[in-house]
Amino acid sequence: MNAYLSDQPVRLSPLRDEQGNQPRFGLLLEPGRPGMHVGELPAQWLKGLARSHHLLLLRGFAAFADAESLTRYCHDFGEVMLWPFGAVLELVEQEGAEDHIFANNYVPLHWDGMYLETVPEFQVFHCVDAPGDSDGGRTTFSSTPAALQLADSSELELWRRASGRYQRSAAHYSSRSAAPIVERHPRREFPILRFCEPPVEGDASFINPSEFHYDGIAPEQRGELLASLRRCLYHPQAHYAHRWRSDDLVIADNLTLLHGREAFAHRAPRHLRRVHIHAEPALRNPHLQRD
């Protein structure tokens, strides 16, 4: 399918994983002419696509020379969320990392902003350097509406009773959050999941994990809860693992999806930049436990 913008064709097609499976979300956008820049696509048009398809991959476009260029581009999407370090998080392995985000660990599924005063609507990722095909490091995305559609009645009943309590200390925050597993999208009312996945049980190598507690269910049902959520969230129709190429741009719906990361080879050339975009108006975090 072609879309014509400023007389320039853009090819749109369903997103597919490396095995050719088509999940129930995601859209691939490719340029219709050599040298076409991402910035030629209207930001509001892309936002509409992201709200409909939840995940956009823009591949093959000319992109951004530096973090400042990416930030200027993101301002067209809406209000950019600022951190103490600025607008852009440099996602690259750090020697002696004190948090799993900056190590080469896997990162379990979660949503961004769960420990902050506001929750961003979108993440914008730009791949500066891609790891090799054998290095790992794919970014994972799971559609929570698709997972809800895949669950059977007993799983749904368990999920609707359960809620999670989480606590985490990191470089820029130390907070507690509590959220029902199943709730309504904060702006659009359809059901979603808010689930922060624990790391592999007993994995002592995982750096700075959150604390996890689940209420509303019997203690012996914890394993059933986690297994059923993982079954549906990692189902090929609900899950997409993205292998990066340099200059890929990914726009993700943080209010609908969960995301994570696969482990990657130590010192692999994996460098992403991430920017958060606020909702309109900015979404005050309903799950943050305020003292």
Curated annotation (Swiss-Prot):
Protein's UniProt keywords contain Repeat: no
Coiled-coil regions, chain positions: none
SUPFAM superfamilies recorded: Clavaminate synthase-like
Free-text cofactor note: Binds 1 Fe(2+) per subunit.
Lineage: Bacteria, Pseudomonadati, Pseudomonadota, Gammaproteobacteria, Pseudomonadales
First and last residue of the signal peptide: none
Inactivation phenotype: Disruption of the gene maintains the ability of the strain to produce the pyoverdine siderophore. Deletion mutant is more sensitive to chloramphenicol and ciprofloxacin in comparison with its parent strain. This sensitivity is probably due to transcriptional repression of mexT and mexEF-oprN genes. Exogenous addition of paerucumarin resumes the expression of mexT and mexEF-oprN genes as well as resistance against chloramphenicol and ciprofloxacin.
EC number: 1.14.20.9
Organism, scientific name: Pseudomonas aeruginosa (strain ATCC 15692 / DSM 22644 / CIP 104116 / JCM 14847 / LMG 12228 / 1C / PRS 101 / PAO1)
Role noted for this protein: Involved in the biosynthesis of paerucumarin, a cyclized isocyano derivative of tyrosine. Catalyzes the 2-oxoglutarate-dependent oxidation of tyrosine isonitrile.
Description of how the protein assembles with itself and partners: Homotrimer in solution.
Cofactor dependency: Fe(2+)
Keywords from the named record: Iron, Metal-binding, Oxidoreductase
Protein name in the entry: Tyrosine isonitrile desaturase
PANTHER family named among the record's database cross-references: GAMMA-BUTYROBETAINE HYDROXYLASE-RELATED, TYROSINE ISONITRILE DESATURASE
Enzyme class (EC, first level): oxidoreductase
Gene3D superfamilies: Clavaminate synthase-like (3.60.130.10)
Residues noted as binding Fe cation in the record, renumbered to the chain: H110, D112, H259
Reactions accelerated catalytically: (2S)-3-(4-hydroxyphenyl)-2-isocyanopropanoate + 2-oxoglutarate + O2 = (2E)-3-(4-hydroxyphenyl)-2-isocyanoprop-2-enoate + succinate + CO2 + H2O
Gene Ontology terms, MF aspect: metal ion binding; oxidoreductase activity
Disulfide bridge map: none
Family: Belongs to the TfdA dioxygenase family.
